[in-house]
Amino acid sequence: MSRKGSTPQRNVLPDPKYGSETIARFINMVMKSGKKSVAEKIVYGAMNVIGEKNSNAIELLQKALDNVSPAVEVKSRRVGGATYQVPVEVRASRRMALAMRWLIDSSRKRGENSMPRKLAAELLDASESRGGAIKKREETHRMAEANKAFAHYRW
């Protein structure tokens, strides 16, 4: 842990097309090796694909993020030689970051032919509470439920 204290939360400018901070954060998480224009093409392409099937793409993205975001997660805590998986609540900013990360990871593993289509399909699935990202959230919740007995080790 840093001795200099915590760093301040950076403000993300809203994206130019939709004027949404959520989409701007999503673009930044899709980005690899600083290639922001490629990430923008992927996210905007996915939003266009969703827009063809659904009326409001931003609402669908928000619904998908809400469905995927975890309420609890487990953290390792070492107590007297034993390591316990202690369930802890997830704060709002981490909840959104995890939801975005899981959506992107599970969309990259999908079988469609292009990344915008993969991302669009995963977002559509997540908005209807199915898909790889939802499985990841359910698995996290199951782990927390199974280790509920160690909740008193919370810090």
Curated annotation (Swiss-Prot):
InterPro entries to which the protein is assigned, alphabetical: Ribosomal_uS7 (IPR000235), Ribosomal_uS7_bac/org-type (IPR005717), Ribosomal_uS7_CS (IPR020606), Ribosomal_uS7_dom (IPR023798), Ribosomal_uS7_dom_sf (IPR036823)
A GO BP entry: translation
Gene Ontology molecular function: any one: tRNA binding
Coiled-coil regions listed in the entry: none
Key word Ribonucleoprotein present: yes
UniProt GO cellular component terms: small ribosomal subunit
Assigned keywords, A-Z: Ribonucleoprotein, Ribosomal protein, RNA-binding, rRNA-binding, tRNA-binding
Function (record text): One of the primary rRNA binding proteins, it binds directly to 16S rRNA where it nucleates assembly of the head domain of the 30S subunit. Is located at the subunit interface close to the decoding center, probably blocks exit of the E-site tRNA.
Family, per entry: Belongs to the universal ribosomal protein uS7 family.
Subunit architecture: Part of the 30S ribosomal subunit. Contacts proteins S9 and S11.
Full protein name: Small ribosomal subunit protein uS7
